[in-house]
Amino acid sequence: MDLSQRLDEMELAIHKPSFRKGTGRANEVNYWVFDYTPEKELEVRERIEYMKNKNDRGDDDFEFVVFDLYDIIIDFLKKKSFMEKCYDFEKKRGIERIVKAVSNSMKVNDDDSLIVRYIKEHTPENAVVFLTGIGKCYPILRSHKVLNNLHQAFVRCPVVMFFPGTYNEQELILFNEIKDDNYYRAFRLAK
C-alpha cells in the first residue's frame, strides 16, 4: 500500500467512533504510531493540515488537536529567553551538552514533563491528539520517551504519533537509521 492509501486508511480509521473509545486493542491505552518514509514528510504534513482544516469546519463530533513537539520546545526556550544561551552553550560545550541541558530544563525524562503537561492542558475532552515534529526534535527529544511519559499521564483520548521512520510495534527506527529504545504499547496505524 502506498503512502496516499495509508493516509486515506488512517483518516477513515480515526473517524470511526470505535477508534475514539478510551482503550485500544486488548485493553491497552489508545496510542498509535503512523510511520512513513522520511522523504514523504511534506506529504504527511499536508494531509494533517487538510484533516485539521476539515475538522475545524465542524464536520466531526470530535476535535483534532495537533501538537508539533519541536514548536513546543522552541516556544519554551523563547519564553525562558534561553535561545541565545543555547546557541552559546552549544558552541562552547557541544551538541551533547545542549541536548542534556534542554532535556533537563524541560524535564523530558519525567512523567510530568513540560511537554506532557502542555499537551494535557491544551487538549479538550472529545479529541484525537496528533503528535508531529518528531524528526525535527531529534536528538533533544526521543520518541519512545514521549510515548512512555504521555502514556503514564494522558489516557483520556487517542494519541497518534506521526513518525518519520519505521515502527513494527516493537521498535522505533527514526529516519530508518536510528534505533530508539524498544516501545511496545502503541499500535501501528494503517499498515
Language model: regions and residue ranges:
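Mid-core helix/loop region of P-loop NTP-binding domains shared across ATPases and GTPases
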Residues: 111-123
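Conserved P-loop NTPase "ATPase switch" module shared by AAA+ and STAND
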Residues: 124-140
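Glycine-rich P-loop/Walker A and Walker A-like loops and their local beta1-loop-alpha1 context
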Residues: 1-56
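A short acidic (Asp/Glu
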Residues: 42-48, 75-80, 139-144, 170-174
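Residue-level preference for the first positions of well-ordered beta-strands
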Residues: 29-33, 128, 158-160
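Glycine-rich, aromatic-bearing surface loops/beta-hairpins
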Residues: 142-191
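Short acidic, S/G/P-rich loop/turn micro-motifs used as interaction or catalytic elements
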Residues: 38-43, 72-74, 105-110, 135-139, ...
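Long, charge-dense
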Residues: 64-111
